[in-house]
Amino acid sequence: ISGGSKKSAEGKLSYMISGSQKAFEVAKPILDCTSETVFEFGEHVGSGSAMKAVNQMLAGVHIAAMAEAITFGITQGIDPKRFLEVISKCAGTSWMLENRTPHIIDNDYSPKSSINIWPKDLGIVLDIAKNSNFSAPLTAAALQQFISAAGSGLGQEDDAAVAKIYARNAGIKLPQN
């Protein structure tokens, strides 16, 4: 499942599922009323979970990369609002950047998706990678930033609060409103 609590409340989740056709047919009415998109991955058990792991890998890395980029930009004198305006129209954008950067600009870290989910989710991704003998250094680096944020007491805040770790380490202030 992908989409978080907001999309869940709107019935706009994305499901990545695998299993028997019979199980899918039984679940279809529920899937249809709670989702915007259902991706089927055949009957091989675990294929949908594998896709979810890939999605979480990208999402977590994108959030950490956004936090790193905006704080780096601030150290270079770039206004955070201008950062969002420009990057959202350039090759460096991502859905996570466009969705999470406003949280930093508005100094609003009320949890839409909390820091605390990322040590779990990226930990699972890295366990899968390890079991597959796959090196995932970007994911490992993102995980360390989320662990640092959780260990600094930010675990219940929105996952955009990982930018506070970058800001602390750089000796800068994020927007305060």
Where do the language-model regions lie?
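NAD(P)-dependent dehydrogenase/reductase Rossmann-like domain
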Residues: E43, G151-N177
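Short phosphate-engaging motifs
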Residues: K22-A23, A65, D79, T93
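Interdomain hinge/lid region at the active-site interface
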Residues: V45, S49, T93-A160
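Rossmann-fold dinucleotide-binding core
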Residues: I1-Q56, G60
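N-terminal glycine-rich phosphate-binding loop for ADP-containing cofactors
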Residues: E10-L13, C33-T37, M51-Q76, K81, ...
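Small-residue-rich helix-loop
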Residues: I78-C90
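Short amphipathic alpha-helical surface patches that mediate protein-protein
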Residues: D32, S88-K89, L143-I147, A167
